[in-house]
Amino acid sequence: MNTVKTVRELRAAVARARSEGKRIGFVPTMGNLHSGHAALVAKAAQRVDFVVASIFVNPLQFGAGEDLDKYPRTLAADQEKLLEAGCHLLFAPTVEEMYPDGMAGQTRVSVPQLSEGLCGASRPGHFEGVATVVSKLFNMVQPDLAVFGQKDYQQLAVIRALVHDLNMPIQIIGEPTVRAADGLALSSRNGYLSEEQRAIAPVLYRSLSQIAQAIRNGERDYPKLVAEQQQQLEAAGLRRDYLEIRQAQNLRPATAQDRELVILVAAYLGATRLIDNLHLDLDTPA
């Protein structure tokens, strides 16, 4: 695996791979990688001949008071994990390489509606930052396909819409969330949790699972289900940001008639914000 830090080097390496007839896969990350990221790279490696990953902590998607400065930078360890997972090329640019003219006047990409509500409500500007940097990276790499984790469900929906609306010839693959044995979704931010908090955190997935089971059992009073689980989260010591049941395809509020749902949660455990979701297809057996 080679590591490059400039757009020029990146494009040259991808051009060489294309000249050899290779299909290109892409996995963008912010680094501090775990088994979930490795699964994304492995999925890409199954589908294409040449896998590119990026590591870039994107300032545009962090708001005031968020964890931009303390977000872990672990490049050496990340390189080892990428190599083991089947990555061929790592793009690890600086902020200056990505935004050579600064960020104040940077052209922005916005995906309305899907970016509103849920994480978009509590993190204003976040998805604009995501859509902008992903658009830049897609233009730099020009992959045949890109793989994203389903843990960031709203982000995945935003990126699917971005690719569709801007006519980008890129296949977007959503890879199922990788979980610890106790159900907690793997996340780079789990490292912020104390031992006591880590023991509490799996309640997020338990709440999602209990809602899903109740719906499968015929319960359609969604506000009641949400209220019950909100109480469970608060009793466990979490501060809820949101807990909602939405239509899986468009993230609109779910009705009793909808058959494909996604249950989404975001909550604070101490100062750490955790997110998770559970997809539910009522036409498919559990």
Curated annotation (Swiss-Prot):
Pathway: Cofactor biosynthesis; (R)-pantothenate biosynthesis; (R)-pantothenate from (R)-pantoate and beta-alanine: step 1/1. GO terms for cellular component: cytosol. One of its GO terms (biological process) is pantothenate biosynthetic process. (R)-pantoate binds at Q61, Q155. CDD domains: PanC. One of its GO terms (molecular function) is pantoate-beta-alanine ligase activity. It comes from the Bacteria. It catalyses: (R)-pantoate + beta-alanine + ATP = (R)-pantothenate + AMP + diphosphate + H(+). It is found in: Cytoplasm. Beta-alanine binds at Q61. Belongs to the pantothenate synthetase family. Catalyzes the condensation of pantoate with beta-alanine in an ATP-dependent reaction via a pantoyl-adenylate intermediate. Homodimer. The reaction proceeds by a bi uni uni bi ping pong mechanism. NCBIfam families: panC. This is Pantothenate synthetase. It comes from Pseudomonas fluorescens (strain ATCC BAA-477 / NRRL B-23932 / Pf-5).
